[in-house]
Amino acid sequence: MVIDANIYWFDEKIFHDDAYAEQFLAEVPRLYQTEGKMEILPNGRKQVVIEKPFGYANVNYVEGDYILENILADMDQSGIDVGILKLPCYHEWLSLELCKKFNDGMADFAKRSGGRLRGLGVVPPRASQAVKDEIDRCLNTLGFTGLQMVAHYGDHYLDDEQFAEFFEYINELGLTVYIHHNPVPVEFNQLYEYNNVRRSYGRNVDQGTAIMRELFSGFFDKFPNIKFVHSMLGGGFFAFKNLILPKKATKAEDVQRFQTDNGDIARHLEKNLFFEMSHAQPWGKDQLEAAVKILGADHIIYGSSYPVRKEWLTAGPDFVRALDISDSDKDMILTENAKRLYRL
């Protein structure tokens, strides 16, 4: 079995139902310099464009990219047995009403796939009884086995105290939560002007910031039963792991500049944090092999970000198989880690 843990889903009905489209676009948080608009491509297809900041496109949802039969055909071509449906960025601002609508849509999509596609529930990060009821519905009625969130909401990362009561409930349930990157980090003023800097590096800065805050704020001391799976390999976290866990100096120093008592942080990295690659080919062979060596194959999950680029799905598994890592490592990345964390 091969599992693609990152197949994007957007409700195609939005392209054909004016009232639904209006409702979706009305919730885009313009107070946070975010804009959403419907456009027509030269070939006649519609697309929803999300800009952040205004005038700078960051996410595109294109009509026809989310057709079940096409997704299954592409999965067949690439040898993908099971895909996990993810919402690309827009759940940062969805109301509970729209979350319910998207949860119903994902559940129906998964049901019609004959078990090939699975969903993760989405809710606003609030501790109201209505939100808890929707989480329970996702798990007990819709058949979802985890939740999906974004790295920050508004100007606040997930370690912010305003989310604590929400995570208390998630901790009680012992859930795996997939953490998708936002289009740009909270502080993006020097990142937005250039397209590749914004769309690639900006997302990694967002994830890296989120993980550092989760680790050093004591988040997992408070919520030890939660497992987070961060996209984009946690913003290339493998490059920084050793830097944030410095060893004690070999000789006595008058000034101690770094925290070296990092046992709890290392423990949370082992138990609570996992990394989905989002796509294999863009990272490259050397980077993925380094990530496996540093983070451990048991902490890395394969995903393709389909349909951003079709080839990331159709050629992604073979790219992982060609890495200079053990067969057991490849099996963990392509299958076993997702199966375990998402209870497939």
Residue ranges and their predicted role:
Residues 1-344:
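Helix-coil boundary/capping segments in enzymes
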